[in-house]
A protein has these predicted regions:
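A well-structured
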Residues: 1-278
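Long, well-ordered alpha-helical segments
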Residues: 197-208, 213-214, 252-253, 360-370, ...
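Post-HExxH zinc-binding segment in Zn-dependent metallohydrolases
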Residues: 243-244, 368, 379-408, 414-416, ...
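Short beta-alpha connecting loops at secondary-structure transitions
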Residues: 340-344, 371-381, 410-417, 435-436
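Active-site recognition of the HExxH zinc-binding catalytic motif
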Residues: 343-368, 388, 393, 431
Length: 449
């Protein structure tokens, strides 16, 4: 395989893609043997993989440099044409669900393919194609807005990722100032953020009602492929977190306040765990990767092979820089069987969390790269977190490589942060339910929810 920077990018000819795809769907519909259907499915997967490969290469390069006009235009191209591909996939999944060789296909590919097909059929309609294009456009607008941050702080011009280490400063005044600088950026752009979100909520409600749903909650569950649980079960889970995790979270925060000698934690104290300073990796990005190679080789032959593949082919872009999108993610370049990890290293313990969390996603999809059908490259959205969170803890025995004398400090902070995330995570989930159940709320009313 070539290095990522050398991978060719060619914009797909959407009309040719649609014609080739529909030809295979017609073969699938009209097949008189199981083998003929299986061959059509193989070809459909080939077409989808080719389009996904170009889409992901363009998306990665755009997120690495959001100011690159060429890949900005390519992202816009896929924003506009992705729903057209969803339309022909809808035809494929409908034909699949109605196959007269369904039992044979289940024996060959498993029942999960048909569960996914059912959810994708039920979450799509030709009536919402233009809405989906607009939704994609809103997502891209949001990414550009966040990446545009140029915050004057400590005599430097910083983006949001570069500002983050100051939120863990041992100087409380610096932590407070960093928080204010972050929120000043948000406040200065509040109208833009509010409009993007308000437009998205109303657009999603419109899509849901067009398809016969009461609101976006039902459609959202289908799009997330939540096939094993309902809103009622999720509400019960939130109650369990409230009853069992929140009391523990309160104790963790109380101990944190005591360690810091504070009567009460403020929002700008939450990321600061120790009066002696938070644990940090003891080297730069190259040093972290070199130790990552050692760690994954010692963890298992399989993880060693995987991480060597990632480093050899430069399938990671890790350091924060101007114009780069925020956050971190893992994606998959199907035609090369190659995961890609995107991150924003900033000298905090979060750099190691990314090295393990996103590598958990990447190792999972690398292990699944030879699946017969594209739908099995990834688990469903939330099931995927099993692999990433597991890798964070599988690698605990090697944390000494990165944190040296601060290893136990890191382990405590890491475990405590994992527990503290649970109340936050379910609060976000409950907020989403509230927002989509009452799409008529104004931005101000949402903020008060």
């Amino acid at each position: 395989m070539k290095k990522f920077t050398d991978l060719p990018y060619v914009r797909p000819n959407i009309e040719e893609v649609k014609k080739d795809f529909r030809d295979q769907v017609n073969l699938l519909k009209n097949a008189i043997t199981f083998d003929a259907q299986k061959q059509a499915i193989t070809q459909i997967n080939r077409i989808n993989a080719a389009v996904d490969t170009m889409s992901n290469i363009a998306s990665i390069r755009n997120s690495i440099d959001t100011t690159d006009k060429f890949y900005d235009e390519e992202r816009t191209f896929f924003d506009e044409n992705g729903p057209e591909i969803s339309d022909i996939n809808f035809e494929y999944y409908t034909a699949l669900a109605n196959s007269k060789f369904k039992k044979d296909l289940i024996a060959e590919f498993g029942n999960q393919l048909f569960t996914i097909a059912e959810y994708r059929v039920n979450s799509f309609s030709k009536d919402i194609i233009e809405d989906l294009k607009e939704e994609n456009k809103l997502g891209s607008t949001y990414s550009k807005l966040v990446a545009s941050a140029k915050i004057g702080f400590d005599g430097k011009e910083l983006n949001l990722s570069q500002l983050a280490p100051y939120a863990q400063s041992s100087d409380r005044k610096v932590r407070k100032a960093a928080a204010e600088a972050r929120y000043n950026f948000v406040a200065a752009n509040a109208d833009k953020f509010d409009k993007i979100y308000d437009d998205a909520v109303k657009l999603r409600h419109q899509m849901a009602t067009k398809m016969g749903f009461k609101n976006f909650v039902e459609l959202g569950y289908l799009k997330m492929q939540r096939s094993d649980y309902t809103p009622e079960m999720v509400a019960n889970y939130r109650k369990q977190v409230l009853d069992h995790i929140v009391p523990l979270a309160v104790k963790i925060r109380k101990k944190q306040a005591d360690r810091l000698g504070l009567e009460k934690l403020k929002h700008y104290d939450l990321s600061y765990f120790y009066p002696s300073g938070n644990p940090k990796p003891k080297g730069d990005a190259k040093w972290i990767i070199d130790n990552g190679i050692k760690m994954y080789r010692e963890l298992s032959d399989e993880t060693g092979e995987f991480f060597d593949f990632m480093t050899k082919n430069e399938l990671m872009d890790l350091e924060t820089k101007k114009g780069k999108d925020v956050g971190g993610y893992c994606t998959f370049i199907a035609n090369y069987g190659a995961p890609f990890i995107f991150s924003n290293f900033n000298g905090t313990s979060g750099d190691i969390d990314v090295l393990t969390h996103e590598a958990g996603h990447a190792f999972q999809v690398y292990s699944s790269r030879n699946q017969k059908i594209n739908e099995y490259f990834w688990p469903t959205y939330e099931s995927a977190e099993i692999h990433s969170m597991s890798m964070e803890f599988f690698t605990w025995p090697w944390m000494g490589l990165f944190f040296k004398e601060d290893t136990e400090k890191y382990r405590y902070e890491h475990l405590a942060s994992g527990l503290l995330f649970l109340p936050y995570g379910v609060a976000v989930d409950e907020f989403q339910h509230a927002v989509y159940e009452k799409p008529e709320m104004t931005p101000a009313e949402r903020k008060d929810t």
